Curated annotation (Swiss-Prot):
Species per Swiss-Prot/TrEMBL record: Arabidopsis thaliana (Mouse-ear cress)
UniProt lineage: Eukaryota, Viridiplantae, Streptophyta, Embryophyta, Tracheophyta
GO molecular function, one term: ubiquitin protein ligase activity
UniProt-listed Gene3D superfamilies: Leucine-rich Repeat Variant (1.25.10.10), Zinc/RING finger domain, C3HC4 (zinc finger) (3.30.40.10)
EC category: transferase
UniProt name for this protein: U-box domain-containing protein 30
Domain named U-box: residues: 63-137
Annotated pathway: Protein modification; protein ubiquitination
Any Gene Ontology biological process: negative regulation of response to salt stress
Pfam families xrefs: U-box
Entry EC no(s): 2.3.2.27
Keywords: Repeat, Transferase, Ubl conjugation pathway
C-alpha cells in the first residue's frame, strides 16, 4: 500500500476536523497562491452543479496541491474525513483500511483511541473551489481553441503558399496541445480537408505539417482508406527519406497506422525507398528516438514476402543484427521478430546466417531479456543451425549456446520453447564427442 509522507503545511494544518483549530481563509489561500490557485483573483463564483468526480477525471492534473491528496490512494480526495490524530483521508479509503482490521493511522502508524471520522468540510470546499476554477478555465480555453481550429480549417480551404504553411503550423500546435481541438478537427470534417493537401505536387514544407497533424488525430477507416492512395503514400515515403528527424518519425507512425487497416495492400509498402528510409532511422546514432517507430513499422510489414525480399536485397539483415546489442528491451524484441520473419524464406535464412554477428548476438539474448526475445532468438538460431549445421552449430556452442539451452530447458518457460531448445541441443551435440559436449555444456555429469 502506498504511504504518504506529510509535508509541513505552514499554518494549513488547521482544517475543520483536526489540527490546531485554525480556520483557513479560502479567498486568501487561493488568491495568494498558497495552493496554486488561478492567477488573478480569489475563489470567484462557482457553479455548484459541477460534479467534483467529473472535474477531477477530466482535468487529470499533475500539479495538485499535496493537501488535496489522500495519503492512502495518492489520488485527490472527494470526501475528505479527519481522524482523531488530525490526519485527513478519503472516506472510502480509510474505511477500507479499518475493514482490513487496522486500528492505526496509516500515515503516522499511531494507535487510534477513537475510530470516529469527521467530515472535513473546509478542505472539501477548498478542493471543490480549486478544481472548479481549473475546470472553468479549461472549458473556456477549450472553447477558444475549438473556435480557432474551425477558423483555420476554413482558411486552409483557400490559403496558398506560405499562408497555407503558417495555417498548418498553427493548427499542428493546437491539436498537439488540446484534446478538444483534435476532436473538433475530426468532427468538423477537417481530416479530409487536411488529407487533400497531400499529393504529387505538395511541397515538403506543407507535407510535413500535414503528417504531423494527422498522426495526432484519431483517424477512422474512411480517413485511412483515403490516405492509401499511391500518390499520397509516395509523398509520405519521400518525406520519410528527406524530411527532418521529427518528420521521418511522423511518417513512419502514419504509415504504421495505415498498415493496421483491413483494406491495406502490401504493394503500398513494397518499395526500396520506404525500407531504405526505415533502416536509416534504425541506424541513426544521433537521433535514437527514431529507432522504435521504424521497428514498429518494420514488424507488421515484414510478414509480407515481397517486403522481406526487398529487405534482403538492400542489406537490411546485417544492419539489424549489428544494432541488437544497443537496443532497449522493447526495440530488441521488435528487431528479433523481424529477423525471425526474414528466416521464413531461404534467401532470408542465408542472409541471417552470413551475418557475422548473428550467432553471438542471439545467443547472448537467450534468458536475459524476456521470454518473447528468447523465443525469437531461439527460432533464429534453429533456422541457421538447421541450414548449415556443420558451420553454425560448433560456432554457436563455442559462444555458450549449449549452456544457455540447458537453462531454457530447466526454466519455467513455455513447453514448446523447451522442446525447441532440446531439439537444438541435440542438433549441436552431433558434432562433438559425449565428453567434449559435456564440457561445452559446463556439466560435470553425463546428460541422460
Amino acid at each position: 500500500m502506498p504511504m504518504f509522507q506529510p509535508l509541513k503545511r505552514d499554518g494549513l494544518i488547521g482544517f475543520e476536523g483536526g489540527g490546531d483549530g485554525q480556520v483557513l481563509d479560502l479567498d486568501t489561500a487561493v488568491k495568494d497562491g498558497v495552493l496554486g490557485g488561478v492567477n488573478g483573483g480569489g475563489v470567484g463564483v462557482v457553479d455548484e452543479k459541477l460534479d467534483l468526480k467529473k472535474m477531477i477525471k477530466e482535468l487529470d492534473l499533475q500539479d495538485i496541491p499535496s493537501v488535496f491528496i489522500c495519503p492512502i490512494s495518492l489520488e485527490p480526495m472527494q470526501d475528505p474525513v479527519t481522524l482523531c490524530t488530525g490526519q485527513t483521508y478519503e472516506r472510502l479509503n480509510i474505511h477500507k483500511w479499518f475493514n482490513l482490521g487496522h486500528l492505526t493511522c496509516p500515515t503516522t502508524m499511531q494507535e487510534l483511541w477513537d475510530d470516529t471520522v469527521t467530515p472535513n468540510k473546509t478542505l472539501h470546499h477548498l478542493i471543490y473551489t480549486w478544481f472548479s476554477q481549473k475546470y472553468v478555465l479549461m472549458k473556456k480555453r477549450s472553447e477558444d481553441v475549438q473556435g480557432r481550429a474551425i477558423e483555420i480549417l476554413g482558411t486552409l480551404k483557400k490559403a496558398k503558399g506560405q499562408a497555407r504553411v503558417h495555417a498548418l503550423s498553427e493548427l499542428k500546435q493546437i491539436v498537439i496541445a488540446h484534446l478538444m481541438a483534435r476532436k473538433t478537427v475530426v468532427e468538423e470534417g477537417g481530416v479530409s480537408v487536411i488529407s487533400s493537401l497531400l499529393g504529387p505536387f505538395t511541397s515538403h514544407a506543407v507535407g510535413s505539417e500535414v503528417v504531423a497533424i494527422l498522426v495526432s488525430l484519431d483517424l477512422d477507416s474512411d480517413s485511412k482508406s483515403g490516405l492509401m492512395q499511391p500518390a499520397k503514400v509516395s509523398l509520405i515515403v519521400d518525406m520519410l527519406n528527406d524530411g527532418s528527424n521529427e518528420t521521418k518519425i511522423n511518417c513512419a507512425r502514419l504509415i504504421r497506422g495505415l498498415v493496421e487497416e483491413k483494406g491495406f495492400r502490401a504493394e503500398l509498402v513494397s518499395s526500396h525507398s520506404l525500407l531504405v528510409g526505415l533502416m536509416r532511422l534504425v541506424k541513426d546514432k544521433r537521433h535514437r528516438n527514431g529507432v522504435s517507430p521504424a521497428l514498429r513499422l518494420l514488424k507488421p510489414i515484414s510478414v509480407h514476402k515481397q517486403v522481406r525480399s526487398l529487405m534482403v536485397s538492400i542489406g537490411a539483415v546485417p544492419q539489424l543484427v549489428d544494432i541488437l546489442p544497443s537496443l532497449d528491451p522493447e526495440c530488441l524484441e521488435l528487431a528479433l521478430f523481424v529477423l525471425d520473419a526474414l528466416c521464413t524464406d531461404v534467401e532470408g535464412r542465408v542472409a541471417v546466417k552470413d551475418s557475422a554477428n548473428t550467432i553471438p548476438y542471439t545467443v547472448r539474448v537467450l534468458m536475459r531479456v524476456s521470454e518473447n526475445c528468447t523465443n525469437y532468438a531461439l527460432s533464429i538460431l534453429w533456422s541457421v543451425c538447421k541450414l548449415a549445421p556443420e558451420e553454425c552449430s560448433p560456432l554457436a556452442v563455442e559462444v555458450g549456446l549449449a549452456a544457455k539451452l540447458l537453462l531454457v530447458i530447466q526454466s519455467g518457460c513455455d513447453a514448446a520453447l523447451k522442446q525447441r531448445s532440446a531439439e537444438l541441443l541435440k542438433l549441436c551435440s552431433l558434432h562433438y564427442s559425449d565428453t567434449m559436449f559435456i564440457s561445452k555444456c559446463k556439466l560435470t555429469r553425463t546428460i541422460q
